[in-house]
A protein has these predicted regions:
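Long, charge-rich, low-complexity alpha-helical segments
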Residues: 1-128, 184, 189-249
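Short connector loops at helix/strand junctions that flank enzyme active sites
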Residues: 78, 136-138, 173
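A general structural signal for short secondary-structure junctions and capping/turn motifs
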Residues: 101-102, 132-136, 168-170, 225
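Surface-exposed beta-loop interaction hotspot
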Residues: 119-140, 146
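Low-complexity, glycine/alanine/valine/leucine- and proline-rich hydrophobic stretches
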Residues: 140-204
């Protein structure tokens, strides 16, 4: 006897499987609608990627992805996070080494735009903070370390600026970015490597004092002030002091 979970898995597999002559007509229509909606979801979440590789190519990869990794959540705004990694493993990535990073930037922007509206942390809150605490990352925050040319390509493709796109030279140096929407407007900000490491450490939930050791005492106050001004955090939570797993030498 099938459990409810088994029945749900079987129904999901039937919806996403390739149609055959044995497929009931009603299910075939529903299946095509489901797959079409999931493919459309990916197109909306990855606009620059879509324009970069073209409608037909994107559609082919999106359909493969839908079959390989169907959604696990009813909220389709959450569907597609694994798509950049899927593209990175594709043959197309060998021809377009920046492709996956363009897709990651698409996803980070999509995430920021659909995150819950949340005010950023007021720096004055720190005056009354407990002795040891960690920051709560802003819901819209996404941290990315991309190829530098990927960011330029992403912008040029969305602006449909062919001249600008043609002038972009290959550049695989790293651009550490934060993507967020703390005050209603989308922001894409490049950080120094040290600032990015600090942001990543704090966003991961490490207490403030050991996290500041990553960047050094001289720059710590200024760096923290900048991160707060950017709106990276939405709150703080008390936390016991703990050591970083890989303390700086």
């Amino acid at each position: 006897m099938y459990s409810l979970r088994d029945r749900q898995k079987k129904f999901q597999a039937a919806l996403l499987a390739i149609s055959t002559n044995e497929t009931p007509n009603g299910l075939a229509v529903y299946r095509n609608n489901v797959r079409g909606n999931l493919t459309l979801t990916l197109k909306l979440a990855f606009p620059a990627t879509l324009k970069l590789i073209g409608e037909d190519c994107f559609h082919a990869y999106a359909e493969q992805f839908v079959l390989a990794q169907p959604p696990r959540n009813a909220d389709l705004h959450l569907y597609g996070e694994a798509f950049p990694a899927y593209l990175a493993a594709s043959a197309l990535a060998g021809q377009l080494p920046y492709l996956a990073d363009v897709a990651w930037l698409d996803w980070a922007v999509h995430h920021a735009l659909h995150a819950a509206e949340t005010p950023p942390l007021d720096p004055q809150t720190l005056a009354h903070a407990p002795e040891s605490f960690s920051f709560i990352g802003h819901p819209s925050l996404w941290l990315l370390a991309l190829r530098r040319d990927a960011q330029a390509i992403w912008a040029a493709v969305l602006e449909e600026d062919d001249n600008r796109l043609a002038g972009i030279l290959p550049d695989d140096s790293v651009a550490p970015l934060i993507i967020l929407r703390p005050r209603g407007s989308l922001e894409i900000i490049e950080l120094s490597p040290a600032m990015f490491d600090l942001a990543l450490t704090l966003e991961s939930g490490f207490p403030l004092d050991p996290a500041l050791a990553v960047i050094g005492e001289e720059e710590a106050a200024q760096a923290l002030g900048l991160l707060l001004s950017y709106g990276l955090f939405s709150g703080i939570t008390p936390k016991a002091t703990e050591e970083l797993p890989c303390p700086p030498r």
